[in-house]
Amino acid sequence: MEFDTIAAISTPPGEGAIAIIRLSGPEAIQIADRIFYAKKNLSEAESHTIHYGHIKEDGEVIEEVMVTVMRAPRTFTREDVVEINAHGGIVSVNRVLQLLLRNGANLAEPGEFTKRAFLNGRIDLSQAEAVMDLIRAKTDRAMGVAIRQMDGNLSRLIRNLRQEILDALAQVEVNIDYPEYDDVEEMTQRMLLEKTELVRASVEQLLQTASQGKILREGLATAIIGRPNVGKSSLLNQLIQEEKAIVTDIAGTTRDIIEEYVNVRGVPLRLIDTAGIRETEDIVEKIGVERSRKALADADFILLVLNQNEELTVEDEALFEAAAGHNYVVVLNKTDLETKLDINKVRELAGENPIVSTSLVNDEGLEALEEAIKTLFFAGDIDAGDATYVSNVRHIALLHQALEALNAVTTGIQLGMPVDIVQIDMTRAWDLLGEITGDSVQDELLDQLFNQFCLGK
């Protein structure tokens, strides 16, 4: 398969030390040669070499650059690739790109370089999606999972499962088409059930990692809730180590929702500092309270903050009711002051949920809180090198569908259905697993997936 030659800026827009303009395609080296001036033509250059020179337009030098030449097939796209390293100015970089376009290159679509790597067989679809996961990773663990997926760990597992299914289907077909062959082992219902159970167990094992994988990939929407002036904004600022929220002794000073991402011991949290939830006549504060209630309803995880220096109120107890059904940690703040809170009542309300004491004004208790969050979601350490990790929402959905098809095979066999009937669901499971790696996928889905990438990737 041969495509045209594409070009795009691969680095983020704006001022910086360098910017990279990438070309890929059959004419990549020739097009770059038309605008690059040095002692040696790029067309004569060996693969994976770097060359110093200038970019000229109508005889005028417009950039001083370093150019990398990489010849097919030992490139990301398996095509000839040229990368021009220029100074990171907005005007100069765009001028170089426009010059390439005028000399025969076409502007790349979002994700087109990665799409070509997939279409040319350099990577499969799950590996291509892992590229975006790596770019978006917010923690070292998330990065580790993405890198392992890019290396093909998930792909190999899925292909092994598909091969198990294919072997069973092939034997069923031989039995149906050539029943007179005595030397071909008959695929009995018992044998097919054993094959199905083997694949089904592996799919279930993959899905068991999905919840933690989804946390690593997307982060947890974390609502910090509590009555006004219990220390919610102080907690936010301590976790992110920045003064993002207003901290005063005046109740109700947080009128809006403040969001910030933070990495807590490998757990990516999207922290939402909500306005204090209470009954109020202040119109502006009332809007903030309503937004807080919505954030609470949508949250994956809750930090419920109480003031240890005050007695438990009806509003506090209502927060426990609102948090029911969520994972949450109770934060008993202001331990530097006299304890007036009924701790036994708090334990009763919290049930099995962790309780951590803090004095945010004295920087006390934060480590214990971080450890409680890590333990709550990651029982022990996640092994980012685990080859069976699944974190992509599309993959999880396909695995669930494949599991349903495999369950249908098991049910059919147990009901005594003929092997040639239950093989329909077996084939469906094979197809669904193939959609994860891109071995069976529609063009419309490919366009949708790769359009999520940035230009130049």
From Swiss-Prot:
Domain TrmE-type G: 219-378
Chief subcellular location: cytoplasm
Residues that coordinate or bind (6S)-5-formyl-5,6,7,8-tetrahydrofolate: 22, 83, 122, 457
UniProt key word Transmembrane: no
Residues noted as binding K(+) in the record, renumbered to the chain: 229, 248, 250, 253
Keyword Ribosomal protein listed: no
Description of how the protein assembles with itself and partners: Homodimer. Heterotetramer of two MnmE and two MnmG subunits.
Job of this protein: Exhibits a very high intrinsic GTPase hydrolysis rate. Involved in the addition of a carboxymethylaminomethyl (cmnm) group at the wobble position (U34) of certain tRNAs, forming tRNA-cmnm(5)s(2)U34.
The protein, known as: tRNA modification GTPase MnmE
